[in-house]
Regions:
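Conserved phosphate-binding/catalytic loop of the ribokinase/pfkB sugar-kinase fold
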Residues: 88, 98-140
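Short gly/ser/thr-rich secondary-structure transition/capping motifs
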Residues: 80, 116-121, 161-168
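Conserved phosphate-binding/catalytic region of the ribokinase-like
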Residues: 2-6, 169-170, 199-313
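Glycine-rich phosphate/adenosyl-contacting loop at the front of the ribokinase-like
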Residues: 1-62, 67-73, 77-78, 252-253
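A glycine-rich helix N-cap at a beta->alpha junction
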Residues: 75-90
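Conserved beta-alpha-beta core of the PfkB/ribokinase-like small-molecule kinase fold
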Residues: 135-211, 232-234
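A short, aliphatic-rich alpha-helical micro-motif
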Residues: 127-131, 176-177, 219
Length: 313
């Protein structure tokens, strides 16, 4: 990976998160313990995490022409990300609202806004950066067209791709067949089971995932499929049938927002830098766990030093 960057098909949202004792019932208003407003988005989070792991990062992040777009430039500067990632379009900048309860569980709503204006043409304009990258990552806060275009460019050039299909929607065949690494959580795995005509009940258990869902997905293009299971850890299945289970790490969780983004970016970057799959999974699980120990996401995403310290490396 020396001299090569991670290319992130990003998303940018102004993220508002509130800490509550419990989730409100329909029609109920609750007092929040804290409210945080910060730059966020799955794509931005993954880019920040990759940078904190020491990777050079390039990519695309779309913002609108409203006041919220002003959050983006200082966020990139603070994270050590290049301003060339920004694409300015007409319309509203993406926004998101998240609630975190006393146990650290979350629920999130996203208005993608300008992120959906990111296009295949934007991707084609960055083709050299994509074909020369060490890894290209995508997520579903943007549309299908830029992901399909970027992944096709990457795979033709022999560059691995990583897809985290969240917020979940059906994965187009053209995207899935160009995906090297597919990372899903338990909710997304259930939805994929239904889409593939499998019985979703119990499909997220390690044994059934490895025996049923993962092989069905691997037949369609990916070389590695990973199921994240929150505090329970993760399970990875390779195209040659290798199954690796990674236990979760016990931490004092205060806010699980961003943990999946930390996991995905860490797994991809560590694999791209030549680490073994077991080591990359372990580092990814640690990154996700450490992210949950602080409120918010931007400052909670851990450094490589913190990950290696917890891993004893």
């Amino acid at each position: 990976m020396a001299g090569k960057a991670v290319f992130v098909l990003g998303s940018f949202v102004v993220a508002c998160s509130a800490k509550v004792a419990r989730f409100p019932r329909p029609g109920e208003s609750l007092a929040a313990e804290t409210v945080t407003i910060e730059p966020g988005g799955k794509g931005l989070n993954q880019a920040i995490m990759a940078r904190r792991l020491g990777a050079e990062v390039q990519g695309l992040l779309a913002v609108g022409d409203d006041l919220a777009a002003a959050f983006a430039p200082p966020a990139l500067e603070r994270a050590g990300l290049p301003p060339s990632m920004l694409v300015r379009v007409a319309g509203s900048t993406g926004s998101g609202i998240g609630l975190t309860d006393a146990s650290g569980e979350t629920c999130v709503a996203i208005a993608s806004g300008a992120n959906l204006a990111l296009s295949a043409e934007h991707v084609r304009q960055r083709a050299p950066a994509i074909t020369e990258a060490a890894l290209v990552t995508g997520q579903f806060e943007i549309g299908n067209a830029p992901i399909e275009a970027a992944f096709a460019l990457a795979r033709r050039a022999g560059v691995p791709t990583l897809l985290n299909p969240s917020p979940f929607r059906e994965i187009p065949d053209a995207v899935l067949k160009q995906t090297s690494i597919l990372i899903v959580n338990e909710t997304e795995a259930r939805s994929l089971s239904i889409a593939l005509g499998l019985q979703p009940g119990g499909m997220t258990g390690p044994q059934r995932f490895a025996a049923k869902l993962a092989p069905a997905l691997l037949e369609q293009g990916p070389e590695l499929v990973v199921l994240t299971r929150g505090a329970a850890g993760a399970i990875a299945v390779t195209a040659d049938g290798q199954v690796i289970t990674q236990k979760g790490f016990a931490v004092e969780t205060v806010d699980s927002l961003g943990a999946g983004d930390a996991f995905a970016a860490t797994l991809g970057v560590r694999l791209a830098t030549g680490h073994s799959l077991p080591q990359a999974l372990r580092n990814a699980a640690i990154a996700g766990a450490l992210t949950t120990t602080r409120n918010g996401v931007f400052d909670a995403l851990p450094t490589l030093a913190a990950i290696e310290a917890m891993a004893g490396e």
